[in-house]
Swiss-Prot record:
Its EC number is 6.3.1.17, 6.3.2.41. It comes from Mus musculus (Mouse). Residues 337-352 have a biased composition (Low complexity). One of its GO terms (molecular function) is ATP binding. Belongs to the RimK family. Catalyzes the synthesis of beta-citryl-L-glutamate and N-acetyl-L-aspartyl-L-glutamate. Beta-citryl-L-glutamate is synthesized more efficiently than N-acetyl-L-aspartyl-L-glutamate. GO terms for biological process: protein modification process. This is Beta-citrylglutamate synthase B. Mg(2+) 1 binds at D264, E277. The lineage of its organism: Eukaryota, Metazoa, Chordata, Craniata, Vertebrata. Pfam families: RimK. The gene is Rimklb. NCBIfam families: rimK_fam (TIGR00768).
């Protein structure tokens, strides 16, 4: 911890995911930022916390220690597929009620926990969404087969709590859907969604931090399946995005109330987009590699900027420079499906490959010259300040 502390910032996560890449990277970045900015920092695991109401006031203990000075900002990373309102959200509500600024806030996390809840929030705001049906109760899947037929086959079927492309099916017809009803697990309801054929096996992952698009990645399936998730073997490459696509991603993040959000956009033949999903606990191992970014560092800078002193750190101020320059230097995404796929086959490699591998180095050298290395840009700016 550094001296002359000017603020207090915590990193709160769950024991089940704290050793995963995003959490380890965010922890690294927050420690570095807090030392650089002379901030008081603490990393906390959810199950170490005891919430109290004593003499009519909210309180907090961590591993038996009574906490007397609370953080001004808490960076939250919880496993959204398993978030429970009676435990995880209770902890986040407690901190929020005590005056802590959470990123993301509990309501924003809830808006993204359930895929249909996400669509409920976005509906009525002019956001392009695939037609989608769902139901109440856990045993009504079979009853929905006739109701959802108006969406036409093939149709997309998803568990509302699924993640990383799991529990997602493309139902060919009613018979196939009936067969699925006997095989699926019913812990959470499913949704039935209109199939966007032209985006089969392809989507655009957009990461938004603090209302700014920090990067975009085109993801493509390598085995013909509908899902393009890198965790399922898909490949990704940095891409530019049209202004319409960027504004759509920002609009979605704003409506959902997220500080950090991963938004997946489906592509149509006319170059427009519709929203597939939003993730408040977005992973970025593939994103960092494909886009040559340090997303954790951007998150840490934004967290520091939320402290009462109101400092906008240098990295966050440079994001607008990068965004503006990339708009003038990069070709926009939005060509017909075949063109994007051809580009992918010529320029991408598996994002799960060794970062030092020849294939990935070749991929990076083939990227358009106008694409930016955020870390290099920052290093150059800092060098100018020192000199």
């Amino acid at each position: 911890m550094c001296s002359s502390v000017t603020g207090k910032l915590w990193f709160l996560t769950d024991r089940r995911i704290r050793e995963d890449y995003p959490q380890k990277e965010i922890l690294r970045a927050l420690k570095a930022k807090c030392c650089e900015e002379e901030l008081d920092f603490r990393a906390v695991v959810m199950d170490e916390m005891v919430l109290t109401v004593e003499q009519g006031n909210l309180g907090l203990r961590i591993s038996g220690e009574l906490i007397s000075a609370y953080p001004q900002v808490v960076v939250v990373r919880v496993p959204t597929p398993w978030v429970q309102s009676d435990s995880d959200i209770t902890v986040l509500r407690h901190l929020e009620k005590m005056g802590c600024r959470l990123m993301n806030r509990p309501q924003a996390i809830l808006n993204c926990v359930n895929k249909f809840w996400t669509f409920q929030e976005l509906a009525g705001h002019g956001v392009p969404l695939p037609d989608t049906f769902s139901y109440g109760g856990h045993e009504n899947f079979a009853k929905m087969i006739d109701e959802a037929e108006v969406l036409e086959f093939p149709m997309v079927v998803k568990n509302t709590r699924g993640h990383r492309g799991k529990a997602v099916f493309l139902a060919r017809d009613k018979h196939h859907l009936a067969d699925l009803s006997h095989l699926i697990r019913h812990e959470a309801p499913y949704l039935f969604q209109k199939y966007i054929k032209e985006s089969h096996g392809r989507d655009v992952r957009v990461i938004v931090v603090g209302g700014r698009v920090v990067g975009t990645m085109l993801r493509c399936s390598t085995d013909g399946r509908m899902q393009s998730n890198c965790s399922l073997g898909g490949v990704g490459m940095m891409c530019s995005l049209s202004e319409q696509g960027k504004q759509l991603a920002i609009q979605v993040s704003n409506i959902l109330g997220t500080d950090v959000c991963g938004i997946d956009l489906l592509m149509k033949d006319d170059g427009s987009f519709c929203v597939c999903e939003a993730n408040a606990n977005v992973g970025f191992i593939a994103f960092d590699k494909a886009c040559n970014l340090d997303v954790a560092g951007i998150i840490a800078d934004y967290a520091a900027s939320l402290l009462p002193a109101g400092r906008l750190t240098r990295r966050m101020s440079l994001l607008s420079v990068v965004s503006t320059a990339s708009e003038t230097s990069e070709p926009e995404l939005g060509p017909p499906a075949s063109a994007a796929v051809d580009n992918m086959s010529a320029s991408s490699s598996s994002v799960d490959s060794d970062p030092e591998s020849t294939t990935e180095r070749e991929m990076l050298t083939k990227l358009p010259g106008g694409l930016f290395n955020m870390n290099q840009l920052l290093a150059n700016e800092i060098k100018l300040l020192v000199e």
